């Protein structure tokens, strides 16, 4: 199995983050620098600004010994500026990626062109807000069919504390049920978990759910 942590606040990589790196290395965990274009598209629409920001990202990954990059995005829906940004992000980060590093996209795969998709190692589908399995199946079908994402590259996403209703409208914890669907709808490449730290009082429960999900995907773990 391959475990990945995406740093959502990597712009402010601290000495505490650096201190965590040896433990991550020991566990074989890949640590990625997240470029949150979806959340910052308003300030990064200018190609020059985006290029300068990507230069800083690439330099930070090298300086801090990170294992690659993840990035978010939104479907361009014919918007030329967004399409240009998507192409630039993939072009620059894929070119900067060294042997053993990863490039991961988080979001709706329609943000990516066919060429861009070929340069991405994994796609984490934006299913963390999905509440029922019927919608989930449609999202997976659209991703693997219309968007052309190979099942071997596709991960599902689930948020801690979120519900996911099955075909019988029975409620399950999204993290554990989504792990089951990674197997039954594919098998797909894996599961991305979000918001693990958001609920202070349920941290122990969140970790148990993640552990159960890992055991579902990797029974030997």
Sequence positions of predicted segments:
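Chitinase-like catalytic core of GlcNAc-active glycosidases
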Residues: 1-171, 177, 185-188, 192, ...
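C-terminal helical cap(s) of enzyme catalytic domains, especially alpha/beta-barrels
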Residues: 199-221
